[in-house]
Regions:
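Cleaved targeting-peptide boundary
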Residues: 11-22
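A short, structured loop/turn motif at beta-sheet edges
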Residues: 99-101, 194-198, 223-226, 238-239
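A contiguous, surface-exposed recognition patch within enzymatic or periplasmic domains that forms
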Residues: 56, 149-151, 158-165, 242, ...
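Extracellular structured ligand-interaction cores
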Residues: 55, 89-91, 129, 187, ...
Length: 300
């Protein structure tokens, strides 16, 4: 059923607008239709007070935790949202799904706190969101830790109990390592399925778009000692994709304690990840340490 008026709390963001039918084929149908049309680049226009802010100023825009989606519903999950600005100038459209019906989640400036270095001008109702993050009780039952983040292009990342963020995943990589410019498909819309009261997982749908391809993604996210993402991805190319990275991972590495050639830095290491650990199709465990070569290298 659609969200009922008596379930919408003033503090929490409330889905609005007409309810539309939604199921697992809704986003794939949108992606197919999108791929049949010419690509339309998203607007990056922002008001002056947001257009050229610094990293520190962007971090000074905080979503109010007590305004989180599902905050008052007694569920295992809550959702908070990121503001547009800094590197994240393109807006994304957020939807909430409940009972097979979807409604758009409107932007409200009252859901955010703006630090003293920022000077919002009016309500700016058309600003919209840049992304979102999910929270769940990972490390103790009475606190909602950050579980995962979807922010920027098709990037997403997650963190398990007692750990810190490392690498990020990407919905799709196009032209990584090629001599020419890399293409960055972006998630333009998200649908958050309202989980059942006893649910131990949450489902997110995303619509992907870029000059070369449209796509539909379904993420079944299950927290625990190991945080698991079951991902269903369907791609609808507008043109041939000669170098597409499926299930791509990305991280940051400058140097490590054993790889300091040409480095004059007091820090022992600077990286988010220092290697790739994987299990291949034969069941072998493989460890590949990262390095920072002078030229781009490809490893098969």
């Amino acid at each position: 059923m659609a969200l009922a008026a008596n379930r919408l709390f003033a503090a929490s963001p409330a889905a609005s607008g007409p309810a539309t039918a939604f199921d697992d084929e809704t986003v794939p149908a949108l992606a197919r239709a999108l791929a049949a049309r010419a690509y339309a680049a998203p607007s990056t226009v922002l008001p002056a007070w947001l257009a050229d802010i610094s990293y520190d100023q962007y971090r000074d825009i905080r979503f109010r935790g007590d305004h989180a989606l599902w905050h008052d519903d007694g569920l295992r999950f809550q959702a908070q949202f990121f503001h547009r600005g800094f590197l994240f100038k393109e807006g994304v459209t957020m939807h909430v799904v409940e009972g097979g019906r979807s409604r758009e989640l409107p932007y409200r400036s009252a859901d955010f706190e703006f630090g003293p270095s920022l000077h919002p001008s009016g309500d700016d109702a058309a600003l919209g969101f840049a992304g979102f993050r999910l929270h769940a009780p990972l490390n103790r039952p009475d606190y909602f830790d950050e579980l995962c983040v979807f922010l920027g292009a098709s990037y997403f990342r997650a963190v398990a109990p007692g750990l810190a963020y490392g690498l990020s995943a990407r919905g799709l990589a196009l032209g990584s390592g090629d001599p020419g410019a890399e293409e960055f498909p972006r998630f333009s819309q998200f649908w958050l399925e309202t989980p059942a009261a006893s649910a131990d997982h949450v489902v997110v749908h995303a619509l992907l778009d870029s000059p070369s391809v449209a796509g539909a993604f379904r993420f079944d996210i299950r927290p625990g000692e190991v945080v698991a993402f079951d991902v269903d991805a369907r791609l609808y190319p507008r043109k041939p994709l000669p170098n597409a990275g499926i299930a791509a991972l990305t991280s940051m590495y400058e140097f490590d304690a054993g790889d300091r050639v040409g480095t004059d830095d007091f820090r022992p290491a600077v990286h988010d990840s220092d290697g790739l650990s994987l299990v291949n199709g034969a069941g072998e465990q493989v460890w590949r340490p990262l390095r920072n070569p002078a030229q781009v290298e490809h490893c098969g």
